């Protein structure tokens, strides 16, 4: 007798072992038809999986997130099936699920063209309509290697050869195509109805640039056409908002081959940067942080003591001088500990909050670089709080409030918070971890925030809170972090004198709100589609004269506004006013001030707001008042 407990708490009993599909059918024909897989004691399995013991089971359908993953995984295999039918000499490698879709890497003697993708997608649709059953068989490693070598799939054979000989290998087949996979997969190809191939890109075999370059075909798959249409529309909007495109259009920054992953900031872009940095500096100062500056290059010995040299060296830029090894800092924390250690610290000094707009460099792979979002040289709004265990809760509460307020000011009102808890391998006692985790939980609770807990995802030296902001397109970006660290103060010898005159290690809280300034500015540009809130905009307004006779008045107006601390310039070029208006509209300047003879005589300006809104003619002082109200509204 086999007892199956269902999600609603009910228990069904079967005289013999049953498959997931049979359990679904016993519940109802609708569920049997909708079943894509099962969750057996928490593990995803195929509908063909045999249950021969008492267990809990949830039937997975296309209404479940797991169901969508199964569909995407199966569609990746459908892609490989179609490619092999159309291009038999193509070699298949790997094809995982990724955010919003999947990809599959192929080795082929020529590049796939857009026409190839169109033909492959058409063949995928034909294969799906055949509704061929997807079957699974388990074989030994040697049997699997032999099979794939016999059909000329050397990459698959190489993957399997790296698997321990004692492991069982799962092979999935539909029609004439067989692939290596851990599964699960849909029961038949007819379940795959909504998908689209997106693009082809290069990828190295096993991610190593020394290996052969493969062709990676990306695709997306969904349960409903409406969802796919919405996703494709979002991609269109994302392309319009691409910070690389807007960075060029708005003359904010550029990146060039001589400095890969490093940003050249132009005057307008640097003005935008400064608005963000100065805003953050004001907020940190008000919250009791002390700003410091630490060296960019430090001796190898410090990085060995911190553990970075042993564990992070491949991502560090290093140099040598006078027979000493140095590293350009990839992070600021070891330097902040040095400042803390300089002098005797008392418990009365704690909490001590050090902040730095620290310039860091990391040797990211060239293929991973992406505009401002993934760079090699970046600045963080980094800070480290040195405190006692009893102060963790109050410091976390203060940080949560500060972070939420900052995100709101920048226009982000949807924040997902994740709390990563202790892993199996960790330092510190269970009591210390209990205290630390509960301190972070209570801090989130005290701020009225909701969060998701991730057991086992914390670092071995402490739990962590992550702050994921959602932009105007619903995309999630991890920016803020509050990481509790019980290790680095010990490794680097940080201590303070406790109330009983004993020497104790402080707890170290690593924290950032915007994270990488470069990345955050990229997010801001895309979130606002380049039309920055007035307080952030590189230019508040531009004064435009209609004819040469108003040039002096236009210049005077601009200078008057500049003296009042406003970011205003005058465009006095001998161009048609319509041309100048169009140009500055494309630059997304919040206000255009047009002056003709009437405005000069009346000492007024004709005001056009961003979006082509005509605000009419008004005295310069009235415009200044309006502009200041706009700036304060966003602050």
From Swiss-Prot:
InterPro entries reported for this sequence: aa-tRNA-synt_IIb, aa-tRNA-synth_II, aa-tRNA-synth_II/BPL/LPL, Anticodon-bd, Anticodon-bd_dom_sf, Beta-grasp_dom_sf, TGS, TGS-like
Chain sites annotated for binding Zn(2+): 333, 384, 510
Enzyme class: ligase
Entry superkingdom: Bacteria
Cellular location(s): Cytoplasm
Reactions performed catalytically: tRNA(Thr) + L-threonine + ATP = L-threonyl-tRNA(Thr) + AMP + diphosphate + H(+)
Cofactor (UniProt): Zn(2+)
Domain TGS: 1-61
GO cellular-component term (any): cytosol
PROSITE patterns associated with the record: AA_TRNA_LIGASE_II, TGS
One Pfam family, short name: HGTP_anticodon
Cofactor binding annotation: Binds 1 zinc ion per subunit.
PANTHER family linked: THREONINE--TRNA LIGASE, CHLOROPLASTIC_MITOCHONDRIAL 2, THREONINE-TRNA LIGASE
Protein's job: Catalyzes the attachment of threonine to tRNA(Thr) in a two-step reaction: L-threonine is first activated by ATP to form Thr-AMP and then transferred to the acceptor end of tRNA(Thr). Also edits incorrectly charged L-seryl-tRNA(Thr).
Protein name per its UniProtKB record: Threonine--tRNA ligase
